């Protein structure tokens, strides 16, 4: 023995010292997004969007004004913070009141400038009132960078894709706390939530791990009454925890939002083996050899089944749960190894005083009385158990799921408070993206389809502030034409692109090669149910949209196809307009659209508008020939708008013009008259509908010179346009985590049940024995799921671990109970064997169950809601599992008397 000690103890010591350096390398990761593997298609798309559009994660720093933000002090602070944030490595862009693009109409056309340049902040109330009115009139600003009530201003920060976003968020927060002065500041967005999650995990590990050891110490001391005994029981789990954390540190595997409970799980679970060994040690009069020979197989089987329980988590689709399963199962093996090798050696050298023969651990006498009742009753125990089982089964179907990280924080936590504030004032901070891939994003057809999809999305209440390149083009076109619509020609679109090309806001929504573009939007409700609903709604909208179109010039329509194509075009736009203005009057909309091509009900309106526009044109410097004589100008204009041959009128009155100038003038006049026709049509037919502004924009767009219809194979003319459209974002990633959570629960549960059943069947050399061994476990699992349904406790990333833990740990109790009964039944009757089992093995099971239950109960002092629930649920299920093993299993054995028990 001394020779073994000479090599063994230094070996353990040196390994422990080495691995302790790994703990110094251990990192904390509070990002629930890491739950999904990086190869998940939605994660890959989300990352690709981040790489191509200057990041995919946004954070918001929100300043609260006193009484509002429209004052010089607040604007200066916003300008200062914005400039400071832009200097931080990992920040790709910042948008704020003092650094956001504004599009304004000026006499010469359109001006692109900053909304409020940092060096030109208003000085007085009148200027601020004017600025406030202007900002609140703009969709791009109101509710985006300033709340509608004017009380809050946001600085929207886009995080670079390949930087440590948590580190960047930490630097932003540090800098803000230094610079904020007396302003109240809020931080929102997933990077800040992840930062808070990591900080919470770090605090919980430092707080809960010592607390768990303390609770275990008290329970074990009450049981064994000797400090040395308790100290020896602690050595295997303490060494195991050190080793596993060291290995994780060296392998660069961080403690996640799931595995942060590992420092509690290892000591709580691992102490069970020492408890059984010490109990056997005292039973056999401190004869360590006899004690070891009697107990090592049950301990080994308990350890292997617990190992299998945690290892079953590798079959999940969620990386954080998979890694937790791998390293916790290895930690269990370490505990088993140290308990069966190191602990017997220590027991042979340490003298431990003999504990009382009478079982005096407080819960034991009470449990003994219950055992006497159970022995005497015939069917009461099984009847009550069956009733509980059936009720639990009913409530299983009411279980809900929750993976949204916001829900992990309590309602009083700053993260939750800020999230609710941002949801109320700014619509949220969780981004969603719709990615378009086309040949050329200067094509008006693509922009029109993008605009239509955006309008569909804006009707959905949980999605806010959608923005795309079509918004910017539409906004600029509105300043020129009066209609927020997409121009007909690519040339006009290119002219508008030229004005905004290279601006930070544009680079975030369209690629430099104009082949890819985004619709981006935000949501904010921290509920998985809503995240699922959002992602499904977006997918529903996208699935309805055709991905292939034909564009045809109205003037070049073949005569034989003209009527059919116009009807198809009208049907297509009828559907668009109907959905956009929420009208059910399909026939009315269709008749209105058809009238543009078939009659001149609005001819007078067209002439009225055309007269005004031509009057303005011939009086401007832009005209090829300016008419100064007002009387003559009116005569010429009247003749032009009533003539079927404009060229003849022009030759009549402008004889000195060259033919090429006449041709140019004719084209310009025709364009003006056509625009008048469009505007006349819009004004005439929009007045009978609600939501007039949106309808006007669509009617104006409809009356352009290019027809758009979904692709049809029988048409062999026109320009074909194909689009690839993809959706990604935080809601759909949460949905993916949610879907995988359910799969993970089912897969891990089935796998651990199969593995444990195989182990115990081999142990008892009987399939019937394996079935009986599973009775307490299956009862506890059904009871656990029933609790979730009855108390409306959602299945989340933490309690998805509980079912495998119930099996992995709970089978321990069953193995020890069955081992003892099988041993005693050879010499005693069932009742006597049961009594002896309870007196000799029952204490170890009760002590083990209570140490595990109370050890996990310390998690209620954590900050994460799922971790609190995890602690409570494990506490309840460990008690139920041990009671089932001690009372329910023997009752079934007593009633059925299976043959395997006597083999």
How would you describe each model-predicted region?
Residues 1-30, 34-35, 41, 48, ...:
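Membrane-embedded transmembrane helical bundles of large multi-pass transporters/channels
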Residues 23-69, 75, 122-145, 158, ...:
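Solvent-exposed, non-transmembrane loop/terminal regulatory segments of multi-pass membrane proteins
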Residues 39, 44, 87-158, 164-167, ...:
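Extracytoplasmic
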Residues 58, 89-101, 132, 142-144, ...:
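Short beta-strand elements
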Residues 58-62, 95, 145, 154-158, ...:
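Soluble periplasmic/extracytoplasmic beta-strand elements of cell-envelope proteins
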Residues 76-85, 167-176, 449-457, 533-542:
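Short amphipathic alpha-helices in soluble, non-transmembrane regions
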Residues 436-481:
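Soluble catalytic regions of membrane-associated enzymes that act on cell-envelope
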């Amino acid at each position: 023995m001394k020779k073994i000690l000479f090599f063994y103890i230094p070996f353990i010591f040196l390994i422990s010292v080495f691995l302790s350096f790994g703990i110094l390398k251990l990192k904390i990761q509070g990002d629930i997004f890491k739950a999904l593997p990086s190869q998940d298609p939605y994660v890959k798309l989300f990352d690709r969007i981040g790489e191509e559009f200057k990041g995919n994660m946004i954070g918001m720093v929100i300043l609260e004004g006193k009484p509002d933000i429209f004052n010089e002090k607040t604007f200066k602070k916003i300008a200062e913070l914005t400039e400071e944030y832009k200097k931080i490595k990992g920040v790709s862009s910042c948008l704020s009141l003092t650094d956001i693009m504004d599009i304004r109409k000026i006499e010469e056309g359109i001006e692109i400038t900053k909304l409020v340049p940092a060096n030109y902040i208003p000085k007085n109330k009148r200027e601020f009132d004017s600025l406030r009115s202007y900002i609140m009139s703009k969709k791009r600003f109101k509710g985006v960078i300033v709340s509608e009530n004017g009380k809050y201003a946001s600085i929207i920060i886009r995080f670079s894709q390949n930087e440590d976003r948590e580190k960047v968020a930490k630097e932003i927060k540090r800098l803000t706390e230094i610079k904020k002065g007396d302003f109240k500041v809020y931080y929102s967005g997933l990077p800040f939530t992840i930062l808070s999650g990591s900080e919470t995990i770090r605090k919980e590990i430092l707080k809960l791990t010592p607390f768990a050891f303390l609770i275990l110490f008290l329970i074990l001391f009450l049981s064994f009454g000797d400090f040395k005994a308790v100290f020896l029981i602690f050595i295997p789990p303490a060494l195991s925890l050190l080793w596993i954390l060291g290995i994780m540190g060296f392998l660069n595997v961080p403690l996640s939002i799931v595995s942060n409970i590992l420092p509690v799980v290892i000591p709580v679970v691992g102490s069970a083996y020492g408890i059984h060994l010490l109990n056997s040690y005292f039973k056999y009069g401190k004869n360590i050899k006899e004690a070891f020979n009697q107990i090592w197989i049950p301990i080994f089987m308990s350890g292997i089944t617990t190992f299998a329980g945690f290892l079953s988590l590798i079959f999940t689709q969620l990386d954080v749960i998979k890694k937790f399963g791998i390293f916790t199962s290895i930690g269990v093996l370490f505990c088993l190894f140290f308990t069966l090798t190191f602990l017997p050696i220590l027991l042979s050298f340490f003298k431990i005083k003999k504990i009382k023969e009478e079982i005096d651990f407080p819960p034991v006498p009470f449990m003994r009385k219950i055992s006497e009742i159970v022995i005497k009753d015939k069917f009461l125990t099984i009847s009550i158990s069956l009733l509980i089982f059936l009720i639990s089964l009913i409530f299983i179907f009411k279980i809900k799921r929750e993976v949204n990280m916001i829900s992990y924080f309590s309602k009083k936590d700053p993260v939750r408070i800020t999230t609710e504030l941002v949801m109320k004032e700014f619509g949220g901070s969780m981004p969603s993206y719709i990615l378009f891939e086309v040949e050329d994003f200067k094509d008006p057809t693509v922009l029109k389809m993008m605009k239509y999809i955006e309008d569909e999305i804006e009707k959905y209440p949980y999605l806010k502030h959608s923005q795309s390149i079509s918004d910017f083009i539409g906004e600029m076109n509105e300043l020129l034409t009066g209609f927020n619509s997409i121009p007909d020609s690519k040339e006009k679109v290119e002219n508008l692109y030229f004005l905004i090309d290279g601006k930070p806001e544009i680079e975030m929504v369209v690629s430099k090669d104009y082949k890819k573009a985004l619709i981006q939007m935000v949501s904010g409700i921290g509920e998985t149910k809503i995240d699922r609903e959002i992602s499904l709604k977006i997918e529903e909208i996208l699935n309805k949209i055709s991905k292939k179109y034909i564009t045809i010039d109205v003037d070049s329509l073949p005569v034989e196809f003209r009527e059919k194509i116009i009807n198809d075009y009208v049907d297509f736009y009828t559907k668009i307009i109907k959905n956009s203005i929420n009208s059910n009057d399909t026939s009315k909309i269709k008749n209105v659209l058809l009238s543009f091509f078939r009659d001149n009900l609005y001819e007078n309106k067209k002439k009225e508008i055309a007269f005004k526009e031509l009057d303005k044109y011939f009086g401007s410097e832009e005209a090829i020939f300016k008419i100064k004589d007002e009387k003559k100008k009116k005569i010429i204009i009247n003749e032009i708008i009533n003539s079927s041959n404009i060229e003849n009128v022009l030759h009549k009155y402008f004889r000195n013009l060259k033919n090429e100038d006449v041709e140019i003038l004719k084209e310009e006049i025709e364009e003006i008259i056509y625009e008048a026709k469009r505007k006349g049509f819009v004004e005439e037919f929009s007045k009978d509908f609600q939501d007039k502004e949106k309808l006007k924009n669509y009617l104006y767009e409809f009356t352009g010179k290019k027809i758009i219809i979904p692709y049809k194979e029988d048409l062999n003319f026109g320009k074909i346009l194909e689009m690839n459209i993809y959706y990604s974002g935080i809601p759909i990633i949460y949905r993916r985590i949610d879907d995988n959570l359910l799969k993970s629960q089912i897969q891990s549960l089935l796998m651990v049940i199969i593995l444990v059943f195989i182990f115990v069947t081999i142990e008892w050399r009987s399939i019937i024995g394996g079935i009986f061994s599973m009775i307490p476990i299956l009862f506890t699992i059904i009871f656990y799921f029933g609790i979730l349904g009855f108390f409306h406790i959602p299945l989340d990333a933490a309690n998805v671990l509980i079912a495998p833990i119930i099996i992995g740990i709970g089978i321990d109790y069953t193995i020890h109970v069955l081992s003892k009964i099988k041993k005693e039944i050879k010499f005693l009757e069932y009742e006597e064997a049961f009594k002896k089992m309870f007196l000799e093995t029952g204490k170890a099971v009760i002590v083990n169950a209570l140490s595990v239950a109370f050890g996990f109960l310390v998690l209620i002092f954590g900050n994460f809601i799922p971790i609190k629930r995890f602690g409570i649920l494990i506490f309840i299920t460990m008690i139920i599992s041990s009671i089932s093993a001690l009372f329910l299993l023997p009752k079934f054995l007593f009633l059925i008397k299976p043959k395997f028990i006597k083999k």
